[in-house]
A protein has these predicted regions:
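C-terminal subregions of glycosyltransferases and related glycan-biosynthesis enzymes
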Residues: 268-357
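Nucleotide-sugar donor-binding/catalytic module of glycosyltransferases
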Residues: 1-290
Length: 357
């Protein structure tokens, strides 16, 4: 039975987190290893809710870290499953129905304060000292204000044989202050009505035929974890729209992509998500990793976000140019020719900013 690694970043989602986590623990497919990454939440209950679910389900491990943005939280999951962290138990004795505390021993690039796991996962004190990362077959990301259909993992796993990536469709729920409601999903724009297996070149050709340059990938499906480790792909830190760079390199490196037109993911579009900043930001609630830019722009959230968006595009374009220098395969070249000019052109929009750091 294949083991699935689930990575869930958490940031100020006390209103939505239970619905998200309930959709995970009630999946019809149960062989899961679930990482919760609290990215410096400042609300009252996000961390407490995460601890509650970690306590009652031994499949969970919770990392509590300094705020660093969505990319850093997802990368904690990738690095943990890759065996890049050594955990040292802070808790010396097991108490029934309690959380065992761990600290990172050595390399700690994302300033992880503590890790927590349920006492149910350990039989004795020796288990504490021998605790290590699980070996997973596939990895999938879920944003903590969203949720899955209860058959999501099962539908993915049965289709992952001999493919590197599975891409599924999603549905959206909208908050009242979100504009552009009820837009078509990328799956609908690309007109994939039936499930199929495609090559990256075929994806690029479909993108050209429908006039779309959308190739983002974060929570959009499942990834073969050995493939992900082989290509050494992670999310770029301290940018927004990090799933564009991730998606382009993921697809350019893949051989086969499974297209599943089922809407298995429920995406909640709201203003103050982990990946979004808007005019409602104040000095009191601005996230830590965004604070320097916010203050540089005189606490003008709109200008600060415009800069972050432009700088993110430049960073993305430069990283993509560097990646494609050494790519010779037909699939990679098709992705490059279809998508790189678009994102390089967007990067040049930084020259239109009124104020540059």
């Amino acid at each position: 039975m294949k083991k699935i690694g689930v990575v869930i970043p958490i940031y100020n989602v006390e209103e939505y987190l239970r619905e998200c986590l309930d959709s995970v623990i009630n999946q019809t497919y149960t062989n899961l290893e679930i990482i919760l990454v609290n990215d410096g939440s400042t609300d009252e209950n996000s961390l407490n809710i995460a601890k509650e679910y970690t306590l009652k389900d031994e499949r969970f491990i919770l990392f509590d870290k300094k705020n660093g943005g969505l990319s850093s939280a997802r990368n904690v999951g990738i690095e943990y499953f890759s065996g890049e962290y050594k955990l040292k138990n802070k808790t010396q004795h097991i108490k029934e129905n309690s959380l065992i505390e761990f600290q990172l021993d050595g390399n700690n690039p994302y300033n992880i304060y503590k890790a927590y796991k349920s006492s149910q996962a350990f039989n004795n004190e020796k288990d504490l000292t021998n605790f290590t990362y699980p070996n997973i077959d596939y990895i999938i990301f879920l944003d903590s204000d969203d949720y899955w259909e209860l058959n999501c993992i099962e539908e993915c796993v049965i289709r992952m044989k001999n493919v590197d990536v599975l891409w599924f469709d999603h549905d959206c729920t909208y908050e009242d202050n979100i504009k552009n409601k009820h837009k078509k999903t990328r799956m609908e724009i690309f007109d994939f009505k039936k499930e199929c297996i495609i090559t990256p070149k075929e994806y690029a050709n479909r993108a050209l035929s429908v006039g779309s340059r959308d190739i983002s990938f974060g929570w959009n499906g499942m990834i073969d974890f050995n493939f992900l480790k082989k290509i050494k792909l992670k999310f770029i830190n301290f940018i927004i729209n990090e799933d564009i760079h991730f998606g382009i390199i993921l697809f350019a490196s893949a051989n086969k992509i499974y297209v599943l037109s089922q809407k298995l993911y429920l995406c909640r579009l709201r203003a103050n998500s982990i990946s979004n900043h808007d005019k409602k930001i104040t000095k009191a609630n601005v996230s830590e990793y965004f604070k320097d830019i916010y203050e540089t722009f005189g606490e003008n959230a709109k200008e600060a976000k415009n800069y972050l968006k432009a700088a993110s595009r430049v960073t993305t374009a430069l990283k993509l140019i560097e990646f494609f220098k050494d790519q010779k395969s037909e699939n990679a070249l098709a992705i490059k020719e279809t998508f790189l000019p678009c994102y390089a052109k967007k990067a040049l929009m930084i020259k239109n900013l009124k104020k540059i750091l």
